[in-house]
Design a protein with these regions (language model features):
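Short hydrophobic/aromatic patch on the recognition helix
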Residues: 38-47
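Residue-level detection of the helix-turn-helix DNA-binding "recognition helix"
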Residues: 34, 48-49
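Hydrophobic alpha-helical connector segments
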Residues: 64-105
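Basic, helix-initiating cap at the start of DNA-binding domains
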Residues: 1-22, 26-38, 55, 62
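Amphipathic alpha-helical packing segments from all-alpha helical-bundle domains
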Residues: 108-137, 145, 149
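A secondary-structure capping/hinge motif
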Residues: 51-53
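Hydrophobic/aromatic-rich alpha-helical bundle segments in the mid-to-C-terminal region
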Residues: 120, 136-190, 196
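Short, residue-level hotspots on alpha-helical faces of the histone-fold
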Residues: 13, 82, 86, 125, ...
Length: 199
């Protein structure tokens, strides 16, 4: 791991611990930097905002590649749903989505209005990439944007509801976050497939 990556990881872990313990709004950037042993300017070299600690990378822009790989003859919504479901079915995505850190990040967003809005804003880059992947002969920009927006809006809502309705996993039991409704990837897949009339 590069020094930059390890500093980013240290800042994220420190911030998440403080947010969980004290609440997102109660923790200033200067306190995060101090607890991590860096300057507040170093914090801003790694994260443009305090919100970015929680919402960055929740939606991987590489999802667009999975959408692009879906059969071109399918309707835009079908391609978008199937592509996102395929992307989150991959082992690295499932592993990340079952981690305690992922749960804590989404849970913070679910319980903090400014973060819920930031999750939706952060997903816009992925949404634009999905829309671009959906434009093929016979599919116009409007249809592609509508399908991408529907899928990303649904994904955001499903994840926020999943984290908001579940208790934190037992710290001593496992490092994964699951509930009676399933892990994040399962809940997300099931919810997205319902857009196609499936479950």
């Amino acid at each position: 791991m590069s020094p930059r990556a390890s500093t980013t990881d240290l800042l994220r872990r420190t911030a998440l611990r403080m947010f969980v313990d004290q609440g997102f709004d109660a923790v200033p950037v200067t306190a995060i930097a101090k607890a991590a042993g860096v300057s507040h300017m170093t914090f801003f070299r790694h994260f443009p905002t305090k919100e970015a600690v929680v919402v960055n990378d929740l939606f991987d822009p590489l999802i667009a590649a999975a959408v692009r790989a879906q059969p071109r003859q399918w309707r835009p919504l079908t391609r978008a749903v199937r592509g996102l479901v395929a992307a989150i079915s991959e082992e690295p995505a499932r592993e990340e989505m079952s981690s305690r850190e992922f749960y804590e990040r989404v849970r913070l967003a679910a319980l903090t209005p400014s973060l819920a809005a930031a999750v939706r804003t952060a997903g816009q880059e992925t949404e634009r990439a999905i829309a671009a992947a959906l434009v093929v002969p016979g599919v116009d920009d409007a249809a592609a944007r509508a399908a991408a927006g529907a899928v990303m809006g649904a994904a955001s809502s499903l994840l926020l509801a999943w984290a908001g309705e579940n208790n934190a996993p037992d710290a001593g039991a496992t490092s994964t976050a699951t509930s009676t409704t399933g892990d994040a990837a399962t809940v997300l897949s099931r919810g997205l497939l319902s857009l196609l009339g499936e479950s």
